[in-house]
Amino acid sequence: SVAMKHLTSFKRELGTLIDAVNKRGRKQNKRGGNEGSIMWLASLAVVIACAGAMKLSNFQGKLLMTVNNTDIADVIVIPNPSKGENRCWVRAIDVGYMCEDTITYECPKLTMGNDPEDVDCWCDNQEVYVQYGRCTRTRHSKRSRRSVSVQTHGESSLVNKKEAWLDSTKATRYLMKTENWIVRNPGYAFLAAILGWMLGSNNGQRRWYFTILLLLVAPAYSFNCLGMGNRDFIEGASGATWVDLVLEGDSCLTIMANDKPTLDVRMINIEAVQLAEVRSYCYHASVTDISTVARCPTTGEAHNEKRADSSYVCKQGFTDRGWGNGCGLFGKGSIDTCAKFSCTSKAIGRTIQPENIKYEVGIFVHGTTTSENHGNYSAQVGASQAAKFTVTPNAPSITLKLGDYGEVTLDCEPRSGLNTEAFYVMTVGSKSFLVHREWFHDLALPWTPPSSTAWRNRELLMEFEEAHATKQSVVALGSQEGGLHQALAGAIVVEYSSSVKLTSGHLKCRLKMDKLALKGTTYGMCTEKFSFAKNPADTGHGTVVIELSYSGSDGPCKIPIVSVASLNDMTPVGRLVTVNPFVATSSANSKVLVEMEPPFGDSYIVVGRGDKQINHHWHKAGSTLGKAFSTTLKGAQRLAALGDTAWDFGSIGGVFNSIGKAVHQVFGGAFRTLFGGMSWITQGLMGALLLWMGVNARDRSIALAFLATGGVLVFLATNVHADTGCAIDITRKEMRCGSGIFVHNDVEAWVDRYKYLPETPRSLAKIVHKAHKEGVCGVRSVTRLEHQMWEAVRDELNVLLKENAVDLSVVVNKPVGRYRSAPKRLSMTQEKFEMGWKAWGKSILFAPELANSTFVVDGPETKECPDEHRAWNSIEIEDFGFGITSTRVWLKIREESTDECDGAIIGTAVKGHVAVHSDLSYWIESRYNDTWKLERAVFGEVKSCTWPETHTLWGDGVEESELIIPHTIAGPKSKHNRREGYKTQNQGPWDENGIVLDFDYCPGTKVTITEDCGKRGPSVRTTTDSGKLITDWCCRSCSLPPLRFRTENGCWYGMEIRPVRHDETTLVRSQVDAFNGEMVDPFQLGLLVMFLATQEVLRKRWTARLTIPAVLGALLVLMLGGITYTDLARYVVLVAAAFAEANSGGDVLHLALIAVFKIQPAFLVMNMLSTRWTNQENVVLVLGAAFFHLASVDLQIGVHGILNAAAIAWMIVRAITFPTTSSVTMPVLALLTPGMRALYLDTYRIILLVIGICSLLQERKKTMAKKKGAVLLGLALTSTGWFSPTTIAAGLMVCNPNKKRGWPATEFLSAVGLMFAIVGGLAELDIESMSIPFMLAGLMAVSYVVSGKATDMWLERAADISWEMDAAITGSSRRLDVKLDDDGDFHLIDDPGVPWKVWVLRMSCIGLAALTPWAIVPAAFGYWLTLKTTKRGGVFWDTP
């Protein structure tokens, strides 16, 4: 019906157009137009158009017409002189413009009366061939949906130092992520180990748990290089002539032998050259020039002439033919289709020949080396102290000449770790891989040998679609590069250009030292004085490098240097690594480097003799016995931060594709809110723990609830990225990011608890090395936190660079002024540097020595490293970590080049009349007063990035010249960054420290607005260089109060404000030109762990050996943020409840659920519907409340604070009425939920109100109701905020004078509560202020003392009193029955009180007086008129 409506409307529109054309023609006739000439011209135009678009030629002996998409709109007429006109119709839907992708097929002849069948082209007089292009301008050519199945490569069997390609699909990536989690959350890892021990009840179970834990921490150990760091020391026996060495990739050996010079032998590179090409695979093909030849039944086989061309792929078949497609008989007709195959992208496989593997080795002598020549290879070669050589299987032996040191011979056995017969180097796109030979040969892709250009198995990347009567389409498959990369998971990535650098393999050499000799043994001792050019430095290998400066000129001479245990005993200890050090030149002040190995403990390095002797105290940590275990121990202590890149969940399987989407949509939001700040491993462990509890639960409903919750947690932990952002609170001037808090307090001091850390120092060191090779000499930090990050990792980077033989050191200088920008960027790389266990362990304690080349971070601009050669803004935030003392922020290299600041730490907000732009450096505050204007800005530091538009408020149509904080130093492009009378402060004092921008007068100065004032200029300080104050200032058209900058060096005015008259030479000018809500607490594992630990303590007796480590572990976890102080409070409450219920059969599981899920009180109202629930009912009700809580967070439905306060008030009243363990514990836990701290006062007020109303409802006597009702009514009036609490309180006191001796204990608490309510209404204080309880305590103490009546009372027996039965009651006076209370006062038993009308009138007078001070006098007069009788009134405090 819908289709018919569209067709009807289309027909109507068509009729309207035809009518309009007809009417226009009739008008032309009336005007005398020549219709015949018009028709002739139209026909001529059609013929010319057809001739211009359609082309005629021949194909296989028949006519071929070439058409485009404009020709198929109408009948195509082909003139034929012999047979007359041939009309053809083309109805193909894939006609495009002409290109290489063409198709040719036959248009059959259909006789009159036959409808076309299974053809999209036909003619009425003669069959012809049609040809057209299939390209379109809007999309790519049609591709096949099919893909080639490529078998997975599998894990490489090579022992390799580099990570495999897409290794994340295997278990090793899981272990690496586990290690990453352990590094970032060590407290959780420690507790997980304790849990694993405690969960096992026997040795067998404990072994299983230990196996699991070992799997979790296995990546911390690596057996490839265990016991071998990047530098090993080998000692030859006395008199030995040779020593065997084993060199690995990037390793270095130091050889020491008696009476021989010390040598360093280093493996520099393993490289394979002249790779032979084996086979090329095509993974992306294109199909062009398709042609189809068809025959009718009984007319023979169809034959396409293009079969003879080897570049074409052809396929024969049969189709149904008959009258509807140009055949006289019905049956199967032959069809032959050919298409041209061409390869667009190919993967090439190459083989490595064993004889083409080269090993580059360097040998260095520990001789007389100056600090300038240290690490300078060319200088050392010139001094015959170093040599490089290449070892190949064809030349395994080499002899090196070392000048005066003799010569050394190496006989090597090259043993590559690579079995060249089993591996190929396969290049796919820009990446190369080491692949197994069998896998390579079994690839189901078109291939060609290197000696041929013809492709085999081409049909694997082509698809012949279903054949029609005379037409068959052919399409190519899409690029298979993605499938190849996925299948290559586990293969080792290599770098290939013309050669391949191998990362596996070793070289076994025999070093012959018989011809080595010490140099300088005949020299005399140096007699002049030495001095330490630099303090001795630890190398990180247990040795010390000393740079000495010699003042004498009697060289060459030997250096008297020794290491002694005491200056009183000159017995040498330790040994010299640089054997027989000497000064080589006779020039004065020459410098020499000496390396020595001091003993463990304290020692002295003594240089020189006699009175010219100098010494340096040295301490070497460790012990002689411990040295034997240092390699393995330091390996075990290694902590490696591995990146989470390339994590791939393809191995989970397709079963989650449908279920997972639903789970993600339902629970994803709640999961991010509750668990966003946690590591995914922690989330997974929690899910596994819930699954384990579900399996062990006896009750079916509880088991199902645990299993469902645990399963959802495990799924979301592995599928939802744990991201957290920043939240901003304007009133408290605080900004939260991750799990930390950033506070900007009232004294304008920044307290930041953030610590930036690189994703992994190994990759950062490689990035620095790569940047330095590309001409980047240093880095400019964007913020002070990035600068602190470089300072923190500097030593570790330098160790990595040194251990990988890179002559480069990272130097971090103190930043000067603002943080400036630079044009270059650091680029990402997948490679990482390697570091041995020993080197890592020593890097923690000792800084490495400085290399010859430096990579400079911050500091002043120098000629060696100008800003144009530095990188900047290359790092962005990846993730937030844990911690109470600081939030760890993990960084990664930016993939794109941008000048924008990192948006992950930026918060913007508008609340009321205040707008704030804020990040970890800036707090920019604007206020609305008739118009929005900038009010103040506080700068932790000044940076040079640009504020992103995505985090900018009201940024439409802003002119940069109006921005007070310039856009180039991260000023927001916002209309909030403006103020009338001021333009952009591009020459403000932005290089100063501790800048606060606001609008006020600098102390001791005045500013006047005058036309005679000077023009804008750089900001000027209000004090001169000598400290003299400049008092008179002016501006032309600024607004007052003036713009000022307060800095550490004084007060500065804005650029519009100039000094009236002053000596220009003494002014201090700015040298800058700037133009060049609430968060829900995360679910924490800590509380759950404490419950389990307590259970184990109760189940088993813990000895001191277990208790002390457990307490220390708990303290560690508390410091690291795994347990919060609120968790401790919840834990104490729950343990108390568990002990209280231990002997009564009660259950505290529902209370534990309230504590762990932090359920808001409003969702627990259902538990209040009955005074007694069974244990199972309690658990189910709380689970329901937990689900309600999760749903409200996910749907972002906030629960109003009054509802939560009312719920807690009702819980407290219920606990007072029915004091069971559950009813008492529940309100305490509810008060500890997030956000309840701001509702304590509301809760107290509601409790008072509930008790008051209940007591009024139960009051049987009108008098008491009037007394208590008056106070409650006054309290209700004051809570609205419209009535004065002081006036109402005074009025009630006057009405009811206190005549009691003192307060009873029950009424004292009522007094405290009422004072809370009144003072809370009077003073709008912060919820964290302690002034309320302090003020109340003082007020109550004074009031109690002043208002009380004290009487000395004693008992004295005067006489015996007895009742006489004769005493009769006579008279007609009214009888008054009284009772005596605890305070000794008499009360009428039945006192009606004042009439209701008088009571209402009095309350109205008191309320009127409280409403406005002007009504106090008339209200007092009206009140006095009601005082007709005198009655004893109750005390003011007589209220619940």
From Swiss-Prot:
SUPFAM superfamilies for this protein: E set domains (SSF81296), Viral glycoprotein, central and dimerisation domains (SSF56983)
Annotated site residue numbers, Cleavage: 31-32, 53-54, 146-147, 222-223, 722-723, 1074-1075, 1301-1302, 1432-1433
Post-translational modification: RNA-directed RNA polymerase NS5: Phosphorylated on serines residues. This phosphorylation may trigger NS5 nuclear localization.
Region (Fusion peptide): 320-333
GO cellular component, one term: virion membrane
Keyword annotations: ATP-binding, Capsid protein, Clathrin-mediated endocytosis of virus by host, Cleavage on pair of basic residues, Disulfide bond, Fusion of virus membrane with host endosomal membrane, Fusion of virus membrane with host membrane, Glycoprotein, Helicase, Host cytoplasm, Host endoplasmic reticulum, Host membrane, Host nucleus, Host-virus interaction, Hydrolase, Inhibition of host innate immune response by virus, Inhibition of host interferon signaling pathway by virus, Inhibition of host STAT1 by virus, Inhibition of host STAT2 by virus, Interferon antiviral system evasion, Membrane, Multifunctional enzyme, Nucleotide-binding, Protease, Secreted, Serine protease, Suppressor of RNA silencing, Transmembrane, Transmembrane helix, Viral attachment to host cell, Viral envelope protein, Viral immunoevasion, Viral penetration into host cytoplasm, Virion, Virus endocytosis by host, Virus entry into host cell, Zinc
Extracellular side: 57-180, 223-674, 723-1147
Keyword Chaperone part of the UniProt annotation: no
Cofactor: how and how many bound: For RNA-directed RNA polymerase NS5 activity; Mn(2+) is more effective than Mg(2+).
Obligatory cofactor(s): Mn(2+); Mg(2+)
TM annotation in the entry: 36-56, 181-201, 208-222, 675-695, 702-722, 1148-1168, 1179-1199, 1201-1221, 1238-1258, 1270-1290, 1303-1323, 1327-1347
Leading EC class: hydrolase
Intramembrane: 1405-1425
Protein name: Genome polyprotein
